[in-house]
A protein has these predicted regions:
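Non-catalytic C-terminal accessory region of glycerolipid acyltransferases
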Residues: 25, 86-202
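Catalytic core of membrane glycerolipid acyltransferases/transacylases, capturing the structured
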Residues: 22-82
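Helix-to-loop junction immediately C-terminal to a conserved catalytic motif
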Residues: 3-33
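Short acidic-hydrophobic, aromatic-tinged amphipathic segments that line or gate anion-handling sites
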Residues: 15-16, 76-79, 163
Length: 202
């Protein structure tokens, strides 16, 4: 959080919906993904330490500086093709700490102004860990890998979604809320991750 004042200095932030942040309980921060700075933006908006799920390839194919950045964010490697028991165990370990979990349900960065191709894994994790999902939208940096100085970025926090809903309902509500907040088009599609196991197996 040392870098937070620098973000406020160099960028124009608008943060909406902080009143929707649950108090006194764990939850999953689930946002759309439009730039490399999204994890920092979500952490600034929520004002809590967040450990982010990241594809395992990021820990293998990038340089030291990039690796230090994702380590600083508390990121841990996951297999995007198949949700593994080890991932659920890592999430449950977070319950013993003051950290929250951060997920980008669409997987990689998407700048086509749509909410689609949502991975089912975040809903499985929410139900397995019994953590509600906090939908978050990020807009204003869709054209850039890194946000140019002076750009206006809006982070909006939606209403928490109960983990007690079915997986399909969780996915639907997340997609609808983020699309509404970002003014993106919501396209209902089948999950990209067909190998996700039912949460009862964990």
């Amino acid at each position: 959080f040392i870098a937070i004042p620098l973000f406020w200095l160099f960028y124009r932030f608008e943060i909406k919906g902080r009143e929707n942040i649950p108090k006194g309980k764990k939850f999953i921060c689930a946002a759309n993904h439009v730039s490399h700075l999204d994890p920092f933006l979500v952490s600034i908006a929520v004002k809590k330490p967040i450990a982010y799920m990241a594809k395992k390839e990021l820990f293998e194919d990038n340089g030291l500086i990039f690796r230090l950045n994702i380590d600083w964010l508390g990121a841990f490697a996951v297999n995007r093709q198949k949700l593994e028991v080890a991932t659920i165990k890592t999430v449950k370990e977070l319950y013993k700490t003051n950290w929250l979990l951060g997920i980008f349900p669409q997987g990689g960065i998407r700048r086509n102004h749509t909410i689609e191709k949502i991975n089912k894994g975040f809903a499985v994790i929410a139900k397995a860990a019994k953590w509600d999902v906090l939908p978050i939208s990020i807009t204003g940096c869709e054209k850039y890998n890194w946000i140019p100085f002076g750009a206006k970025v809006t982070v909006q926090i939606g209403k928490p979604i109960s983990y007690e809903l079915s997986q399909d309902e969780l996915i639907e509500q997340w997609g609808q809320q983020v699309a509404s907040m970002s003014h993106y088009k919501y396209i209902e599609t089948e999950s990209e991750n067909s190998e996700v196991q039912d949460q009862q197996e964990f």
